[in-house]
Amino acid sequence: MSATSDRESDFESEDENNFQDKVFNVKSKTSSFFHANTSDNEDFSEDEEDKDEQDEGDTKTKPKDGKHNFEDIAYDEESEENIGDDEDGNADLSLDGGSKVNKKLKKLTSKELAKEQKRIKRTGVCYLSRVPPYMKPAKLRSVLSRFGEIDRLFLKPEDPSVYHKRVKYGGNKKKNFTEGWIEFVNKSDAKLCAATLNGNKLGGKKTSYYYDDIINIKYLPGFKWLDLTQQIAKENEVRQAKLAMEISQQQKLNKSFVSNVEKSKMIANIQKKRKTTDDDNIRRDFKQRKVTTTRSDAKDDLKSKSKPTDKLNDILSKVF
């Protein structure tokens, strides 16, 4: 078998299924561990989560009228279909704090709204501070789905400048992600995932590409997916505000520069005109030839002929 097929079937072998059974057997122990070691700052959120888990356990163990609630299952499937995932399975977070939906949203009734709020209250979000190199969202979803059903998943791509620099010097052309957030349908599954994988190897087959990668994952108590989308929208707004401020400052600098250039041209033209007017006041003297005439009635001074110059004498000497 090729290396790619081994990577795709890392977590589908019988050994992994046995490991999965062991992990879910430890679920009750880890949940009790969380109840015993909560901090003072997170007591209020943990109490609410415990109540939600009890309500969730009651609904799971005691279905209404001895039948499964197929409406919840259908609603979850519809919500998963409406999630805007890209080709890699990464949830697309829009600026308005929600996922992209092509169809028009229908108004929810009071019952549907209460049901949706209850579903959101049951969810839990984990933060992944480091994503294994070149791991795609679809692969991460298949790895973490061992612990429970995953609703949405978002991985932050690396900076484009870093990617272009790596490719320019002959590096790997695959996409790389820096951090991510994973939303579990049940917060107990999110706690179990964080307690099991945090600080440990990803595991699987030894031939796996991600076998030795250390996972750093943390459960975020009281944190919902809406908080993440609002935070991203806020960061985008701050970035747009900074960009608009820089553009306005640059426009002011350009206007001041153009006005200064026009003023300098105007001053230069004024000074040039002043110089021309000053030059016109200068009185110039021109040498003129004396007036002579051959008229008989003219004065003797005017009848005198001009004396030959040196140039004329030289020419006459050469001729004669």
Swiss-Prot record:
Keywords: Nucleus, Ribosome biogenesis, RNA-binding, rRNA processing. It is found in: Nucleus, Nucleolus. Its main location: nucleus. Residues 1-10, 57-71, 276-285, 296-309 have a biased composition (Basic and acidic residues). Residues 27-39 have a biased composition (Polar residues). Transmembrane segments: none annotated. This is Pre-rRNA-processing protein ESF2.
